[in-house]
Amino acid sequence: MTHPPSRAILAAAAIVMMLNACTPAPTEPTSPAPEETSMPIQQEGAPYPADLDHLDDILTLGKTTLPEGATTITITPATKFAESYPGGWGYVITYHADPQPIRNHIDTYTDLKGENLESYPDSTTFLHIKDIDFSSIHHPVITGFGKVQLVVERPLGRCWLLIRGAPR
């Protein structure tokens, strides 16, 4: 023998259905990862949008390249530099590379010796590089050449290339 549902059960079920209808369903993150974005980010005054389609052009501005085999490449605008320097613009290029190509890159573009990267003391002055979050970077070495600041994390793998400019 079955009994019809009581009014209390029906009311509770109706309330649960209404609450579920008012609660947004979980969604995927609304912001795509920088390498997935289809809309380039154009910083005022910058010669190119901060996107992978313009990577070679951006690297040419700094008269540099990335280490051979670099992967997981992202480009973001250097907005903190732009805020602190009237008319300034810049790009932060983040990437991963194997140790030997990083050493070769250091040898080619800086005064440091790539073979000695592990023996250099950790860089501790980050005041001039506000567009890179150093809180999760272990044992950084910072070096510069021209318009470029290069941050290398040890053990070798993660790197950041900051290219900045301004009107003349």
Feature map (PLM): residue ranges:
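Terminal, regulation- and interaction-focused segments at domain boundaries
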Residues: K80-T108
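Extracytoplasmic low-complexity, Pro/Thr/Ser/Ala/Gly-rich segments
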Residues: P29-G87, Y91
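Extracytosolic low-complexity repeat regions of secreted or lipid-anchored proteins
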Residues: V92, I102-A166
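Juxtamembrane and targeting peptides
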Residues: V16, T27-E28
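C-terminal motif of bacterial Sec signal peptides marking the signal peptidase cleavage site
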Residues: M18-A21
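Bacterial signal peptide processing site
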Residues: T23-A25
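A short, structured loop/turn motif at beta-sheet edges
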Residues: T64-G69, D98-I102, P155-L156
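Bacterial N-terminal signal peptides that target proteins for export
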Residues: M1-L10
